[in-house]
Design a protein with these regions (language model features):
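Globin-like tetrapyrrole-binding proteins
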Residues: 1-159
Length: 159
């Protein structure tokens, strides 16, 4: 895998520069609450907080821990953009760990959609609308790369 197929140097720089501003203020807990609002059945995929009432999720230690782990993987993916082989290995491994949940391409499409909307809503507005549009366009191939590799690995048939 060559990340250059997905992101050029400028896009990589924009993703890395904007990420700290996007991820602040409980991004990952908000991601999961937005995901579960959109698709309530997805919460059932998480054994440790499958039956926690929605209103109590943000105070549930297992929910918070999973949110932190997701953030760690995403941060690592951003850090490894210039080392595509390492990035690919980490994403494939993560996808393989998700095979047991029998997720479908649709699950991953919903995740990508929720992430895209959240990132677009949090893009820094300094620099005006042209800069915001440039940032949004830089994030699209990154999300396609990350979610796509995880999905391909998670949905692969293992012989």
């Amino acid at each position: 895998m060559k990340s250059s197929r997905f992101l050029n140097e400028s896009q990589t720089a924009l993703v890395k520069q904007s990420w700290p501003m996007i991820v602040s203020n409980g991004f990952w807990t908000s991601f999961y609450t937005n995901l579960f609002k959109r698709s309530p059945s997805y919460q059932l995929q998480f054994d440790r907080f499958a039956h926690v009432p929605f209103e109590e999720l943000e105070s549930n230690v297992h929910f918070l821990a999973h949110s932190v782990r997701t953030g760690f993987v995403f941060n690592t993916a951003i850090e490894l953009l210039e080392t595509p082989d390492e990035l690919h290995k980490i994403l494939v491994d993560l996808g393989a760990k998700h095979r047991k949940f029998r997720l479908t391409a649709e699950h991953f499409e919903v995740v990508r959609d929720v992430l895209t909307r959240m990132i677009e809503d949090r893009l820094p507005t300094t620099g005006g609308p042209d800069r915001v549009a440039l940032l949004a366009e830089a994030w699209k191939p990154f999300l396609t790369l990350v979610i796509g590799v995880i999905m391909d690995s998670a949905t692969a048939t293992v012989n």
